[in-house]
């Protein structure tokens, strides 16, 4: 039932290749058509540029007052990836994100393979349909597609280390397991909390393996220590006024400690807020219900039969649903990608132990079908905010830019030498980020840029102080 025997043998590299093309059609096409934005690709690409020159980014790209970008998100991936910016330019982070997801899919393949074969990896040329369907489920998961449709984010890359963490721990390759622990932590200041919950959940699975338990305990101690040092010491020292991440939970407190205290002292309200719209805005109505339904249909329902793995999702759900930012509640953007490795690996690890053949087959065949259907729904009909033209690669509108002539924009961009300072509309800034001074309009006007490049809908009413250099009625280039 699970051995494919076509004339051309299907293997994992065929699946990876097809997924890579599909992901490039999402992410790279969006960038070519100026559907990537200042927040966040422009900001992070400019940070790469700064780090590649051995200096910190001062956040003036989107802030009036200079402050270290690491006080916004403590993201060390940008430092690690910065040399690549000299090779791939503004495409760097998009390529890194695509490659990382494919890397994560290979991790799913390896982990599910050893689960299916009771700890022994299958043949390199294996066409085991069970393992292939796990990969396909992962690559079709809605959180991954929606993340690809919106710029680059380091939590996507961090999540791709999790299947490898599962695999290396299962194989008792503890040095590589430790590498995965570190790589998850350094992505953002909230990643260690997720890591700690992952490792706590795994303790039940490895409860009879004393050595594995010691390594899990070590990972937990590292995660807690990293969280405390970064979130409670380093980031406040970089910006004493506010920790950006905590700004989304202001109603609970101004620090991790205050938020934790609020949760424990208001348990009923906390549980209620996980499911209802607690903001005075109708924009949040139905978003949480939609997300939970999508999560359950995409395999979350099967995870109910592996309850210790539900602990891995607790911090993910909490940071989404307890946030004051309504954008986090829904299925869109990068806010659901971490569920992919947990749910897919959990479901297939559980299915590998099912003795009833008909039940095992039902689960593993249903998973990619359900993941694909949910992703189609989120790309076409979701209530949550999703830029549909960014992710619908089978529609003509994905390959068009209706707001302006892209060839004209590229012509204007070539007129701006790299040494000049520029303030620009959001969609232009990722392409202008490889320079010392680039600013997001309109906040960047306070930095007195030499040139201003705007879309027509960003055009200010008063342009008397600006000298028009060129326009086609859709895009304007000014000198100041």
Residue ranges, per PLM feature:
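Extracytosolic helix-loop segments that constitute the early lumenal/periplasmic catalytic or substrate-binding loops
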Residues: 25, 44-69, 76-77
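Membrane-lumen/periplasm interface segments of specific transmembrane helices
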Residues: 26, 40, 50, 57, ...
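Hydrophobic/aromatic-rich transmembrane helices and adjacent perimembrane loops
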Residues: 98, 102, 310-356
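Transmembrane-helix motifs of polytopic, lipid-linked glycan transferases
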Residues: 91-120, 164-167
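Start-transfer (signal-anchor) and selected internal transmembrane alpha helices
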Residues: 1-25, 110-113, 123-131, 210-219
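Signature aromatic-anchored transmembrane alpha helix within multi-pass, membrane-resident enzymes
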Residues: 13-20, 125-129, 217-224, 353-385
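Perimembrane helix-loop-helix junctions
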Residues: 194-224
């Amino acid at each position: 039932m699970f051995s494919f025997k076509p004339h051309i043998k299907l293997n994992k590299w065929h699946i990876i290749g097809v997924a890579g093309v599909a992901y490039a059609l999402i992410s790279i096409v969006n960038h070519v058509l100026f559907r990537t934005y200042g927040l966040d690709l422009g900001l992070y690409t400019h940070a790469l540029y700064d780090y590649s020159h051995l200096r910190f980014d001062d956040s003036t790209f989107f802030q009036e007052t200079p402050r270290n970008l690491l006080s916004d998100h403590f993201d060390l991936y940008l430092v690690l990836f910065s040399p690549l910016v000299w090779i791939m330019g503004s495409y760097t982070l998009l390529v890194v994100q695509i490659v990382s997801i494919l890397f994560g899919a290979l991790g799913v393949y390896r982990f599910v393979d050893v689960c299916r074969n009771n700890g022994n990896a299958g043949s390199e040329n294996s066409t085991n349909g069970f393992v292939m369907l796990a990969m396909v489920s992962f690559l079709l998961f809605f959180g991954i597609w929606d993340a690809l449709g919106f710029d680059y984010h380091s939590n996507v890359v961090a999540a791709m280390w999790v299947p490898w963490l599962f695999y290396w721990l299962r194989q008792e390759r503890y040095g590589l397991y430790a590498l995965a622990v570190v790589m998850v932590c350094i992505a953002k200041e909230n990643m260690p909390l997720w890591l700690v919950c992952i490792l706590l959940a795994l303790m039940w699975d490895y409860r009879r393996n004393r050595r594995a338990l010691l390594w899990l305990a070590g990972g937990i101690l590292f995660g807690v220590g990293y969280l405390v040092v970064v979130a409670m010491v380093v980031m406040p020292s970089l910006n004493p006024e506010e920790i950006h991440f905590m700004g989304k939970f202001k109603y609970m407190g101004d620090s991790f400690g205050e938020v934790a205290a609020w949760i424990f002292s208001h348990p009923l309200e906390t549980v209620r807020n996980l499911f209802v719209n607690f903001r005075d805005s109708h924009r949040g109505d139905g978003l949480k219900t939609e997300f939970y339904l999508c999560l359950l249909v995409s395999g979350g329902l099967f995870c109910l039969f592996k309850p210790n793995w539900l602990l891995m999702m607790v911090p993910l759900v909490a940071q989404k649903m307890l946030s004051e930012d309504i954008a986090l509640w829904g299925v869109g953007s990068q806010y659901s990608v971490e569920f992919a490795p947990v749910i897919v690996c959990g479901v297939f690890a559980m299915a590998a132990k099912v003795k009833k053949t008909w039940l095992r087959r039902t689960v593993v065949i249903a998973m990619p079908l359900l993941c694909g259907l949910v992703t189609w729904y989120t790309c076409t009909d979701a209530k949550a905010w999703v830029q549909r033209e960014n992710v619908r690669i089978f529609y003509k509108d994905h390959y068009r830019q209706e707001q302006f002539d892209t060839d004209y924009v590229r012509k204007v961009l070539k007129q701006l030498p790299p040494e000049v300072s520029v303030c620009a509309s959001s969609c232009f800034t990722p392409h202008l980020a490889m320079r010392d001074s680039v600013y997001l309009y309109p906040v960047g006007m306070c930095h007195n840029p030499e040139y201003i490049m705007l879309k027509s809908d960003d055009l200010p009413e008063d342009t008397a102080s600006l000298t028009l250099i060129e326009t086609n009625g859709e895009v304007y280039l000014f000198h100041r």
